[in-house]
From Swiss-Prot:
GO terms for molecular function: L-methionine-(S)-S-oxide reductase activity; peptide-methionine (S)-S-oxide reductase activity. It comes from Brucella melitensis biotype 2 (strain ATCC 23457). InterPro entries: Met_Sox_Rdtase_MsrA_dom, Met_Sox_Rdtase_MsrA_sf, MsrA_MetSO_reductase. Its EC number is 1.8.4.11. This is Peptide methionine sulfoxide reductase MsrA. Belongs to the MsrA Met sulfoxide reductase family. GO terms for biological process: cellular response to oxidative stress; protein modification process. It comes from the Bacteria. SUPFAM superfamilies: Peptide methionine sulfoxide reductase (SSF55068). Gene3D superfamilies: Peptide methionine sulphoxide reductase MsrA (3.30.1060.10).
Length: 218
């Protein structure tokens, strides 16, 4: 396979015939958040809400959100594909269909979805399709997965507002996929809160420099 063919393959979602089979049992992961000590898989306090963000390599994306006041816990994992309970190595092949994502569990009385969305839009480049900077492939695509129709509508409205802001600077279009949440599979313990365990580790987050115009009032 030529370099061009290999590159093109990495930028395409796999067919059902190509996807890896995965497994029935979940991949073992940490029980508690390395930074906060809160449970990664719950139970969480009443009133918490959830959203999944994909914005390239999940190491830097997770750190971005665990630092936000009102975020109760974060976890990295895989979503949006077909392979059940994939490993990191399988996901990196591009043959699971999954994106690297961050689960953000937050208290809406302290931080709003709009505030989280503003961080999402400003801290990566949502116009790059199946890549994020030097990280190339469907695994690194930009996604927002919500857990109800109301939150999906909020996310779509934020996308439209940010698209206009980008267009005013000659950038775009936005390629971020927004849907209600598919199955989420927790990544291995090694990847959870990676940049807290490895402060000098890789972080590929790079924004466009365009501010998000979303109203941030509660």
């Amino acid at each position: 396979m030529s370099f061009f063919d290999s590159y093109r393959k990495k930028m395409q979602m796999p067919s059902k015939e190509e996807v890896l089979p995965g497994r029935v049992q979940p991949i073992p992961t940490a029980a508690a958040h390395f930074v906060s000590g809160h449970p990664l898989k719950g139970p969480w306090p009443d009133g918490m809400k959830q959203v999944l963000f994909g914005m390239g390599c999940f190491w830097g994306a997770e750190r971005l959100f665990w630092q936000v006041p009102g975020v109760y816990v974060t976890a990295v994992g895989y979503a949006g594909g077909i392979t059940p309970n994939p490993t990191y190595e399988e996901t990196c092949t591009g043959l699971t269909g999954h994106a690297e994502v961050v689960l953000v569990v937050y208290d809406p009385k302290v931080v709003t979805l709009n505030e989280l969305l503003a961080l999402f839009w400003e801290e990566h480049d949502p116009t790059q399709g199946m890549r994020q900077g030097n990280d190339i492939g469907t695994t690194y695509r930009s996604v927002i997965y919500t857990f109800n129709a109301v939150d999906r509508a909020v996310a779509e409205k934020s996308r439209d507002a940010y698209s206009q802001a980008l267009a005013s600077r000659g950038l775009g279009p936005v390629t971020t996929q927004i849907t209600e949440a598919p199955d989420f599979y927790y990544a291995e313990d090694y990847h959870q809160q990676y940049l807290a365990k490895n402060p000098d580790g890789y972080c590929g987050l790079r924004g466009t420099g365009v501010s998000c115009p979303i109203p941030l009032a509660h």
